[in-house]
Amino acid sequence: FREAFVRIWSERVVNDEFNALVLGAELSWREVVVFRAYAKYNHQVKFGFGTTYTAETLARHVHIVSLLAAYFRTRFGLEIANRQGELARLEREILSALDQVPSLNEDRVLRRFLELMNATLRTNYCQGADQDAKSYLSFKFDPAKITAMPLPRPAYEIFVYSPRME
């Protein structure tokens, strides 16, 4: 929490609704940036839900957000033992939790994060520790794995998120 507060106060991290995940889902400031970046990408490809609604949905389902964060760390972390087995276990747990979400729109928002994580081929997230983290986050996507992606779909897409570019 302290590191997130310092970064928000010093305006190195955006101060918005996504920061509720620091306390609610016990995420680090960098993990919150991952969710914010995916939400901004959703906005760019006209997914249909605004970033405020997305942030509010995430805040209402912090257990699922915690599972999604663990999924992301497992998918892209360095030196993860039994990566495929752990990803399969986490995905089953996420899908089971999603079955309990009463709102169809909230279900779509939450499933979209899992879909985007699975469509992400590469990211710079793991380059450097928290204090050495880059000021931007980049993803390389396989658009064929993203439903409702506007046509024409490129073979690959690079998305860079930075608070300085907003």
Language model: regions and residue ranges:
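Extended, well-ordered protein cores
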Residues: 1-166
